[in-house]
Each structure stands twice: as C-alpha cells, then as structure tokens.
C-alpha cells in the first residue's frame, strides 16, 4: 500500500479485523506469544468488520472489551465470527453477558490439554443456554497420547458442544504435516480429525468409522 503499512489480515480476508495482538497464556504449541508477545498490544484504531480475530478476548481488560463492543455498536457492523475465540481460564459469566448481545456467531474456545478440563467445563456451564451448534470447541490432538486426546473430543460432545479437531503442527514446520509422536500414526491423526470435523460422530462411533473409512 503506497504511503502506509500493509494490513496483511485484510489482504488475507477483507471481512476480518483485529483489535489486539499478543496473548499472556504462552502455550508451547502456539505461535502467537513467539510472534506477538505475551503482553497485549491494543489496537484501538481497528476498523469493525464481521470477523474479529483477537487471540484472547476474555483476557483483555473489561474496559477494553467494552470499548470493542461499543465500537461495533456505533458502526452498525454485525459481528458474525469471533474467530480465535475466548480463553476458558478467563471466561466468566460477566464475559458471556458482555458479548452475548453482539456475538451473532458461535462461541469458540479450546480444550487443548487434559489439565484444562475444569476450566473448559466451567465455560460450557456458563454457555448452557446456547445450542450445541453455537458452542465450537477447538481440540488439539497429537500433543498428548491418543486416549487423552480422544477423551477430550468425547467430553466436548458429551457436554453438548461441537468439536473442531486440529492435529498439532510444529511451530517451525515448512509444510502442514502434523507431529507424529506417542502412540499416534499419521493415519490415526487424519481419521480422528475427519470423524470429528465432518460430524461423522453423530452417526457412527470412532472405532467403527476406522473399519469403514475410505482413505
């Protein structure tokens, strides 16, 4: 862009915007703290667009969350997708009440490790009045042994949410090939992701799917 700094996000998706960068969580498998830092950089001059891509909205101060919401309300732009979602450790009843009036899309959050179970379950309970289709849970797989990852997927389903499974890819990867470790195989990673993300779990158990799947 002549005379200014290119906005890579808008070039990637003209319907997307971001009101802050960085994340204090410092998850080992996430590129955000390495690229953007563990402290938030606020971007108050952001332009409201239908897709909001902030990394960790619920960990922002209440004042800045309200600032983002007010800016959307004044712009008359509908917020259709809070893409990266909310962090279970910082998501509260107040967070839900704050964003409920403006969030027209799904409530997205993650269940990446078994140690997060309590925080994720609490988030699910806060969202208990929302339909399953509006509770989308990112589930990282391949970062723990199969049984632990599979258990997280099953818990998400049992709690009345919809899982979106993401095989772990190394931060320095040059391709999108997932990490294969513990008792995983590349095929098992693909199978679990397909079974979950294509809603096949609604009609067939995972063990039965492995027997009939088409590679």
Language model regions located:
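Acidic, low-complexity intrinsically disordered segments
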Residues: 1-53
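A short acidic, often aromatic-flanked loop/helix-cap motif at beta-alpha or helix-coil junctions
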Residues: 1-3, 89, 171-173
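A basic- and aromatic-enriched beta-loop-alpha substructure that forms the phosphate/nucleotide-
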Residues: 1-5, 9, 185-186, 206-214
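Generic hydrophobic, helix-prone segments enriched in Leu/Val/Ile
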Residues: 4, 8, 72, 189-196
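Short acidic, gly/pro-rich beta-turn/loop elements at beta-sheet edges
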Residues: 12-14, 27-29, 62, 92, ...
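Core AdoMet radical
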Residues: 31-123, 133-142, 162-167
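Short amphipathic alpha-helical segments
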Residues: 43-44, 192-215
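Conserved C-terminal portion of the radical SAM core fold
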Residues: 50-51, 103-108, 115-201
């Amino acid at each position: 862009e002549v005379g200014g700094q290119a906005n890579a996000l808008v070039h990637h998706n003209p319907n997307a915007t971001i009101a802050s960068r960085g994340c204090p969580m410092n998850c080992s498998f996430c590129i955000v703290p390495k690229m953007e830092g563990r402290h938030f950089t606020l971007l108050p001059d952001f332009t409201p667009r239908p897709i909001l891509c902030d990394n960790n909205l619920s960990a922002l101060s209440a004042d800045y969350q309200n600032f983002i919401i007010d800016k959307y309300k004044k712009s008359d732009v509908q917020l259709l997708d809070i893409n990266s979602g909310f962090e279970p450790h910082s998501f509260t009843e107040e967070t839900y009440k704050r964003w409920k009036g403006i969030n027209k899309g799904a409530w997205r959050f993650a269940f990446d490790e078994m140690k997060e179970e309590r925080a994720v379950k609490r988030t699910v309970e806060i969202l208990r009045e929302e339909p399953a289709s509006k509770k989308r849970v990112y589930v990282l797989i391949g970062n723990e042994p199969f049984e632990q990852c599979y258990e997280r997927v099953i818990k998400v389903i049992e709690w009345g949410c919809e899982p979106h499974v993401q095989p772990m890819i190394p931060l320095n990867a040059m391709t999108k090939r997932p990490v294969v470790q513990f008792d995983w195989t590349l095929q098992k990673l693909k199978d679990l992701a397909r079974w979950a993300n294509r809603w096949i779990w609604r009609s067939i158990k995972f063990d039965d799917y492995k027997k009939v799947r088409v590679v």
